[in-house]
Amino acid sequence: MNAPTSVTVRVPAKVNLRLAVGPVRGDGYHGLVNVFHAVSLYDEVTVSPRSDLAPGQAVLSVDGERPDHVARVPLDDSNLAARAAALLARHVPHATGVHIHVHKAIPVAGGMAGGSADAAAALVACDALWEGGTPRERLLELAAELGSDVAFPLIGCTAVGTGRGEQLSPLPVQGTFHWVFALVDGGLSTTKVFAEYDRLRPDAPEPTLDDALVAALAAGDARRLGAALTNDLQPAALALRPELGDLLEAGRAAGALGALVSGSGPTCAFLAESADHARELAAALRASGTCADTVTAHGPVPGATVV
């Protein structure tokens, strides 16, 4: 059987339903309890072999619907997808050089783990291209080496991440939840947001999982879930981008069941009652003038999948 000439993997964005941030640990990372929720906003990563490159070496290209976001994607070795290919190549016998093409729909530097999702997709795509047959458990270990948020897009759905966020345990979810994501101009540096968090909260307690949130997910109760959404990084994101406070308030005024900054921001997430309510909420947010654009999505959805 001939090896494939290219492989495309579709990978979802995430929203953090709970991001509890503890003190800095001895390894320099913050302890986290992070409830990840995969939503139907997807990047597509396509890999194809390049015989003129060393095994694991990658060249990158990117396109997408939003040129301002595409322009912010690094095309050098700092790109997590390129690092994923290089890492996997050290662990499979028939690695080649690769061209990695990313079609972006997940906001860049928006707090929805777009770069991490692309890295997860690159692991799956390169393993299929190189016929590595790497077990999913091993891919999860490699993903954790790349970054705290890279493992979750491999499994998708809804999961709690502990440690620095990479130790995953799936959570039961009943039904489907509907979301609006409000996009704003510019990004926010995760490093700067965590630094501001440390300044604002130097004596952070150990992070915990919220039983009310877990129960709301298991019951499929959107109203209870909306009331349980929390993000410890939100005050830091608002300190760096105060205008996000107006955006969150606009969503609440328009009837969102819950509103929060997604991850380190600046994208903001709003929970709706239904798909119709999500469309109405998105229109109200655009009309408010507090965001550049909106997208609607639902979750949970599966993780990185070959298409």
Curated annotation (Swiss-Prot):
SUPFAM superfamilies listed in its UniProt record: GHMP Kinase, C-terminal domain (SSF55060), Ribosomal protein S5 domain 2-like (SSF54211)
What is the reaction catalyzed? 4-CDP-2-C-methyl-D-erythritol + ATP = 4-CDP-2-C-methyl-D-erythritol 2-phosphate + ADP + H(+)
Q: Name one GO biological process term.
A: terpenoid biosynthetic process
Question: Does the record's keyword annotation contain Ribosomal protein?
Answer: no
Pathway(s) the chain acts in: Isoprenoid biosynthesis; isopentenyl diphosphate biosynthesis via DXP pathway; isopentenyl diphosphate from 1-deoxy-D-xylulose 5-phosphate: step 3/6
What does the UniProt record say this protein does? Catalyzes the phosphorylation of the position 2 hydroxy group of 4-diphosphocytidyl-2C-methyl-D-erythritol.
Q: Which HAMAP family match?
A: IspE
Q: Which family does it belong to?
A: Belongs to the GHMP kinase family. IspE subfamily.
Q: What is this protein called?
A: 4-diphosphocytidyl-2-C-methyl-D-erythritol kinase
What is the organism of origin for this protein? Thermobifida fusca (strain YX)
